[in-house]
Amino acid sequence: MPSIGFVAPLLPGKTETDRAAMVSCWTGDRTADFERSRKNLGITREAVFIQSTPQGDLAVVYWEADDVEAAFADMATSDDPFDRWFRDHVRDVHGINVEDGFPPPEQIMDYRA
């Protein structure tokens, strides 16, 4: 299964906003919409971690998807109400406009036993 990991810096003061939103997607009132969105986008696994650093907090994201590039592109253009909310959330807490594209990270290692 194709996968990708990436980080997105959290804007100052936005860590708790992001934490609450991600919990609402995972186990809260947005779970059904989140699951429908990810199914429609072909994302089969999504994990999000918050990493504190001296320079500020980061969201560390891991995706598995049938087609990672298509999932990013479809998320950026989807008219689904949840996907629109999610893009607004990303803009609010990370300062990233998903619609502008997101360059993939360079993978430099992939160990598997």
Regions found by a protein language model. Name each.
Residues 36-37, 52, 108:
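Residue-level signal for alpha-helical context at structural boundaries
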Residues 1-27:
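Long, hydrophobic N-terminal alpha-helical segment
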Residues 97-113:
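Short, low-order "capping/linker" segments at domain edges
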Residues 5-9, 45-77:
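Short, well-ordered beta-strand segments in beta-rich or mixed alpha/beta enzyme
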Residues 31-44, 64-102:
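An amphipathic, aromatic/His-enriched active-site/gating alpha helix that lines ligand/cofactor pockets
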